Amino acid sequence: MSPGADVRSIDGLREWIAAAQVFGHDAGEALGGTQMEIRRAFDWIAEQGHLWERAGRVGEQEVAQAKAELAARRFPNFDGKMPDTTVQERNLRRAEDRLEHAREQVLKCRSWAGRLPKIVEESFTGRGRRLQNFLEGELPRTLGQLARRVEALERYAD
């Protein structure tokens, strides 16, 4: 026959049950908050991708405009001299740099949009699902059994 539980404080068991219930609630809230943050990360990456794609389209227009301005300055003046095109060349370089930056950002967003699901799956989904199953099933069932045993101990003690 196995030895008894050697319970010395029924109140201590009640306090432990209450603390475990608080833990279950807090862990559930944390899990829900983490899931929400993951959804926000997916949404943010998608939104950033759209913003950078739009910036790329604007950049293409700016490059076209800068090229047109530069081409217009390459014709000789009325006196036969070639006008200075440094400002237009600088504007073209800046527009091309902005366009290149936007294109790089689009590629980064696409890369992260492809990588993030795998990262989440590897580091969170399995563990999160196990924790959620524990919090929704095993913990309440175990605490219910413990509460019934505490009630039995109280009846025995009276």
Residue ranges and their predicted role:
Residues I17-A20, G24-L31, W52, G56-V63, ...:
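Long amphipathic alpha-helices with heptad-repeat character
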Residues G24, L31, V106, R127, ...:
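Conserved NTP-handling cores and scaffolds of large molecular machines
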Residues S2-A5, R14, A46, H50, ...:
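A composition-biased, non-transmembrane "mature-region" signal
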Residues L31, Q35, F42, R103-A113, ...:
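Long, hydrophobic, amphipathic alpha-helical segments used as structural scaffolds
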Residues A46-T125:
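Extended, amphipathic alpha-helical coiled-coil scaffold segments used for oligomerization/tethering
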Residues R129, N133-D158:
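Extended, helix-rich structural scaffolds rather than catalytic motifs
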Residues G33-R40, E89-E100, G126-L139:
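A short, terminal or domain-edge coil/loop segment
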